[in-house]
Amino acid sequence: SNPFFTEFQTEYGVPSFDKIKLEHYEPAFLKGIEEQNQNIEAIIESPEVPTFENTIVALDNSAPILDRVSAIFFNMTDAETTDSLTELSIKLAPVLSEHEDNISLNQTLFKRINDVYQQKDSLNLTIEQQRLLDKTYKSFVRSGANLDTKQQARLREINKELSTLGITFSNNVLNENNAFQLFVDK
């Protein structure tokens, strides 16, 4: 079974690297995207008035599988990549970029976030909750939630291209660092 589909049953939730194989990553990303989409759909379709709990916290907790697999995968590709991991990262980059755009450019979801944000001064939030609300709201705004439809379509194109270029650049830097040799003559 795929170790990413459940929480790691180790002390402190440390990943079980001995159980993680290359073939586990892609299905975990795809299932994580599906899980987050379902959770976001539940947030959007909620008939309840948007609150910090049913919108901001729900969004923050919407992707346990995706968070788990992303944390490990991207650390592995940054620190100890292989040709197979590199190929997979290039394959997944546009998929993940599209998924992120589908969230950050979702007008119904942003409206709920904005509704909570506009009443932030009257919510009696803790400092941590205020930080999460500010971070969530600003992330959506900075990711294009306030752009018109035409601008959002262009942003999606740019993000898709950037995702692949960013991975390629990172891999080139890593390959050059790994190939570096220092010769010292006596």
Descriptions of predicted regions:
Residues 1-186:
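Zn2+-dependent metallopeptidase catalytic domains
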